[in-house]
């Protein structure tokens, strides 16, 4: 049976923040937890599915692989066995869900949250994508407050341990048969109290800021490629590690070339006389114009391959080709003399269709036979 989409399992969108993913997970895990649904196999299966989705979507590497390749990107067996993790009901809440059913990190203080990952959509021209370049990107983000060094407390003071939860960030409450832990209402789950908050960040430890990064874009990138910059995401809470920045590449349509992998395609118009008599034509490439030899009697639609004139692979040393499709252009805006010459030329072909236009002759012979058979 095929697996459901992880985002669908948690009921979130692909651009949902990690914080919202955690909220969705917490709500669904409470709903399907075996302690609340004893003997219910369907609830147990749903619980495992929810946990699996959460563990993938809150791991930046696994999430990136899943976003790009789907379930195959996070399947350790690549086609067999499915998800490699286990749904251990004893430790499932140790990460983010330690406040439910009395689980969680016993005896340890709440850990400050890692910074959120950021995404930057970068649009490139085909030439930029093929050759590579260095781009200056201006990124709006949350940065550690330089006034309090990310502590949230005014310089010269320090956060103090919360007296309500004793630094745990959680308090225990009884709900029927269950001992439920919830975020401490005094410190809002932080485990610390900032009595004298920093004037710049107002006790948050982070401030909104824009930073400029110089990002090297490798030659050969294409739409859908993603570049990861470790540690360039939002600053973590109160000194926790920062998130990562993902640069999502898209390539604009080109006026001449179409790209398919490492190959480039283009259409080149040629005159009737050039197609019939042959000769050389100029063909555009990303490196400049080159001459292409057209054999006599070339038919419209013929494809010519120019090896090594495509795109160098971003993952290897292979270079694609340029494939040129010649399209014969019917002359327009003819003067009387030109029309007369064409009529004379047409007269010279009378009765010689099989010799000069074998495809057309074969086609019309087939049409004639079709109507004869139809009327017989």
From Swiss-Prot:
- Mapped CXXCXGXG motif repeat ranges: 145-152, 162-169, 184-191, 198-205
Q: How does it assemble?
A: Homodimer.
Regarding protein family, the annotation reads: Belongs to the DnaJ family.
Cite the binding residues for Zn(2+) 2. Answer: 162, 165, 184, 187
One GO cellular component assignment for this chain's record is: cytoplasm
Q: What is this protein called?
A: Chaperone protein DnaJ
The record's annotation in HAMAP family points to: DnaJ
GO molecular function (one): ATP binding
Give cofactor(s), names only: Zn(2+)
Report CR-type zinc finger ranges.
132-210
- Enumerate the PANTHER family for this protein: CHAPERONE PROTEIN DNAJ (PTHR43096:SF48), DNAJ HOMOLOG 1, MITOCHONDRIAL-RELATED (PTHR43096)
Q: What does this protein do?
A: Participates actively in the response to hyperosmotic and heat shock by preventing the aggregation of stress-denatured proteins and by disaggregating proteins, also in an autonomous, DnaK-independent fashion. Unfolded proteins bind initially to DnaJ; upon interaction with the DnaJ-bound protein, DnaK hydrolyzes its bound ATP, resulting in the formation of a stable complex. GrpE releases ADP from DnaK; ATP binding to DnaK triggers the release of the substrate protein, thus completing the reaction cycle.
Q: Which CDD domains match?
A: DnaJ, DnaJ_C, DnaJ_zf
| Keywords, ordered alphabetically | Chaperone, Cytoplasm, DNA replication, Metal-binding, Repeat, Stress response, Zinc, Zinc-finger
Binding-site residues for Zn(2+) 1, renumbered to this chain = 145, 148, 198, 201
